[in-house]
């Protein structure tokens, strides 16, 4: 049922102009076996099922392909392969919503509204529901971090010799930062500049490797985290005027598909991806 609702919302969110995605040809560079290759990883965030994560990366690839003809020659000369680095939903990830329901005795829907300032919550109550499960690096699963780091290392090393771009969403940004740090703390370290990050809706205070990020001013979840942890990266984009803001499915302005369905956030994210891929194209991983 949840997947059906998600699919319905995705279809509604894409404008009629987006329907051209279905007619977009594959990347010309991918037809050339000698063309350099970059793996673009999507790392999902909080309470994202595997099916939802696949929808998210599909949306990302379609938006990228739609704009590829207008991107730099360096990006077009590369074959950009999209891949999912999935974070299983469970355990501490689900604790975010469980805390909202059990500790505060409210539904997640009402929780969003309360955090928007429509009612009076104390900072302590918000902290109890948010601070630990969502932002505490100690609660991130170590085996998942190791698996992510290994996936990036395998792409960069011979015989793959690929560059890596990571696009994490929500808590996926914390996993990505941790995997990046692990990757470069264990020998042999990848060549400098072979990994770039473009974060979306990040609860983190930094982007590893001096990467880029986009967080919307209307992202209720990240705004709530910033209330407790002021050093959380500030908002630097928005969803503009869009029906998504009136949708019951827009997830408090935090949805990845929402970020890629509304402007200027969509344009900003794709611009960051283009600049990151352009920089990666100048690096030889092997």
Where are these regions (language model features)?
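Bacterial N-terminal signal peptides that target proteins for export
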Residues: 1-6
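Lipolytic serine-hydrolase domain surface
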Residues: 54-58, 101-102, 190-286
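Active-site catalytic motif of lipid deacylating hydrolases and related acyltransferases
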Residues: 27, 32, 36-162, 244-263, ...
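Serine-dependent carboxylesterase/thioesterase catalytic core
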Residues: 134-226
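Boundary at the C-terminal end of the N-terminal hydrophobic targeting segment
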Residues: 20-24
């Amino acid at each position: 049922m949840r997947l059906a609702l998600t699919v319905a919302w995705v279809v509604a969110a894409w404008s009629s102009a987006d329907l051209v995605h279905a007619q977009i040809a594959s990347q010309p560079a991918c037809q050339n076996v000698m063309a350099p290759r970059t793996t673009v990883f999507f790392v999902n965030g909080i309470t994202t099922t595997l099916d939802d994560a696949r929808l998210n990366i599909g949306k990302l690839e379609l938006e990228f392909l739609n704009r590829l003809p207008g991107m730099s020659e360096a990006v077009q000369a590369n074959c950009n392969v999209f891949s999912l680095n999935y974070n299983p939903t469970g355990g501490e990830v689900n604790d975010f919503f469980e805390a909202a329901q059990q500790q505060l005795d409210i539904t997640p829907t009402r929780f969003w509204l309360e955090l928007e300032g429509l009612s009076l919550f104390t900072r302590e109550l918000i902290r109890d529901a948010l601070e630990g499960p969502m932002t505490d690096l100690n609660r991130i699963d170590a085996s998942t971090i190791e698996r992510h780091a290994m996936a990036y290392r395998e792409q960069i090393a011979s015989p793959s010799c690929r560059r890596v771009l990571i696009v994490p969403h929500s808590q996926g940004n914390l996993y990505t930062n941790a995997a990046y740090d692990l990757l470069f703390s264990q020998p042999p370290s990848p060549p400098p500049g072979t990994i770039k990050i473009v974060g979306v809706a990040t609860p983190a205070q930094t982007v590893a490797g001096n990467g880029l990020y986009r967080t919307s001013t209307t992202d209720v979840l990240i705004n709530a985290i910033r209330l407790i942890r002021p050093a959380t990266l500030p908002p630097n984009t928005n969803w503009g005027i869009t029906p998504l803001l009136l949708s019951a499915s827009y997830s408090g302005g935090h949805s990845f598909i929402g970020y890629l369905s509304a402007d200027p956030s969509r344009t900003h994210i794709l611009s960051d991806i283009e600049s990151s891929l352009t920089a990666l194209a100048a690096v030889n991983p092997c």
